[in-house]
Amino acid sequence: MKVVASVVLVLGLISFFCNKKLNDAYFLRIIHESKEYLKSVQMYNTYRFDEKGKPKYIEAISNNSGEENFLVIIGESQNRKHMSAYGYSRDTTPWLAVQRTKENFVIMKNGYACNTLTMLALSQALTEKSQYNHKTLDKSYSLIDIAKAAGFKTYWISNQAQYGSYNTPITLIANSADEKIWLNSDSSASSSYDEKILPALSMVKGKGKKVIFIHLYGNHWEYNNRYPQEKYGIFDNSNYNGKVVDLKKLNAYDNSMYYNDCITEKIFQYAKQNWHVSNIVYFSDHGESVLNDNKHIPGKYDDDMGTVPVYFYFSDEYIKAHPDIVKRTKNNEGVYFTNDMMYNALIDLWGIKTPHYDVKENFLSDEYGYGAGKLLILDKIKI
């Protein structure tokens, strides 16, 4: 019954998102793909646990010596074209703009989302499943699975709604973490500011190597609910001269971008001072079409929905211990990639050896096998 209800819900959403009349063949294909995807989600835990409910063995070995901590920050609906660190006219990301000039910082120039919907984008970015390997979600291990198998304690801190334990693949993936901290029980219309993340950071403690995931609410619609208005509402009609469908929405989106920059700075500072992180990775699930007011609706796809920020911080200790990885990252800062390849890049950065890794899908590798002309978004649109 839950599966049937989920299929109906997904079909309803797809029909809404696709701003066109569906013909019979297309409608039948959507039904088939939705059923297969939901079946895959339903079978997700079966692949990971035996009949007694114990986790199955996963081959994964950490090559790192000592106590190394890694942080992954996941943004939401963030279009890099609205970030001053990427050349945007408004000063929306002053902190990041300064960081990009530092030797221990690398900003990737050509990162793209694999999908415009969070559920579908992150279920690939965080697992073996990608647009290129045709694996199903239920037969794909996640970054949390691999990190735990390699001896890391894992944390998931989220300012996004958890919904039900079995309602989304993101919740399924997150629930495999050793520690889960859910900070937002409301809907996307709520003003659950990302500053709620900051006091929760102190809950990550103790010795031993760790991988911490932080999932922000970021720049999700409605944009004016993503930041405290009085302090961060710095952009108005007087400081934008370009073409836009709705200037009020643009101002709110750019204000949310500025707020995101401030919150990310504070997370970075805390992580470096208190967790002594070796590496921090930031990426967004998908972009946002703000100028055309199409948000991230697949049926109205434009390039702004695909362009996302991806950047890396390396500690001095990490640079000394892994100069080859840092060099490769800098050499590849201009390569084109989609964020369903984050899984393989992060395994590389964390120094984990596992058969559940594909060097061809690691955009930080010298053996990277993709690039402009070979990449997809939404499984069909070429980049």
Regions found by a protein language model. Give the residues of each.
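Active-site-proximal alpha/beta segments of enzymes that process anionic O-linked groups
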Residues: 6, 10-72, 77-240, 307, ...
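Short beta-strand segments
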Residues: 156-158, 212-218, 254-257, 279-284, ...
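A short beta-strand-to-alpha-helix junction
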Residues: 134-139, 247-258, 300-306, 319-346, ...
